[in-house]
Amino acid sequence: MKRQKRDRLDRAFAKGFQAGVGGRSKEMCPYSNLDSRSQWLGGWREGVDGRITGLFTK
C-alpha cells in the first residue's frame, strides 16, 4: 500500500516548526510562494514560542 505525501502546506508548516525549535532565523525561509511562506512562518512562530516557554530544547 502506497503512503500519501503530506499536503505541501502542512509540510511547509512542519519545516517551519522544526526551524523555529532549532533556533533558525525567520529570514531563512526557503519558500517564495505566499501561501507556503505564510505556513512556514506560522510553524516557525509556534516553534519559537515552544522553545522560549521551555517545551523544547536544542
From Swiss-Prot:
Question: Where is this protein found?
Answer: Cytoplasm
Presence of keyword Cytoplasm: yes
Per UniProt, the keywords (alphabetical) are: Cytoplasm, Translation regulation
The protein's predominant localisation is cytoplasm
GO biological process terms held by the UniProt record? regulation of translation
Stated family: Belongs to the ribosome modulation factor family.
Q: What does this protein do?
A: During stationary phase, converts 70S ribosomes to an inactive dimeric form (100S ribosomes).
Report what the protein is called: Ribosome modulation factor
Q: Which organism is it from?
A: Shewanella amazonensis (strain ATCC BAA-1098 / SB2B)
What is the phylogenetic placement of the source species in the record? Bacteria, Pseudomonadati, Pseudomonadota, Gammaproteobacteria, Alteromonadales
Q: State the gene name recorded for this protein.
A: rmf
